Design a protein with these regions (language model features):
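Motif-centric detector for short Cys/His coordination patterns
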Residues: 1-101
Length: 101
C-alpha cells in the first residue's frame, strides 16, 4: 500500500509540473523595486513587494534573499518568514484574504 501511495504522489507531481507554472529562478530587482520570477516556460512575472503580505516594508537586503523551492512551485524568504505559491502569485494572490481586503 505504501508503494502505491508513493507512486500516486509521484504521478500527481509529474502532472502538476507539466500543467502548473514553476519558477526556475527568482530575485529582487532593486532598480525597479520588483520581485522577478523567471518561469520554466520561459515567461517572466514580476510584482512590487509592497503588495505582498510579509514583504511590504522589508529592506532590499532581506528581499534579495528569496529562495525558490526545489519543485519550483514556491518562493521563500527565511528572514521574513514569508512563503508564496508561484501559481497563486500568478493568479493575483499576494496574501491571505483578510490581508488583501
Amino acid at each position: 500500500m505504501k508503494e502505491y501511495a508513493i507512486a500516486k504522489a509521484r504521478e500527481a507531481a509529474t502532472i502538476a509540473n507539466a500543467v502548473e507554472p514553476r519558477a526556475e529562478s527568482a530575485y529582487y530587482d532593486q532598480s525597479s523595486d520588483r520581485i522577478v520570477i523567471n518561469l520554466k516556460s520561459g515567461a517572466t512575472f514580476s510584482f512590487p513587494p509592497e503588495i505582498a503580505q510579509g514583504l511590504a516594508g522589508a529592506s532590499p537586503e532581506d528581499l534579495a534573499e528569496v529562495e525558490v523551492t526545489p519543485s519550483g512551485d514556491g518562493l521563500h524568504w527565511e528572514k521574513l518568514d514569508a512563503d508564496f505559491s508561484v501559481p497563486a502569485l500568478l493568479a493575483g494572490v499576494f496574501g491571505t484574504a483578510v490581508w488583501m481586503a
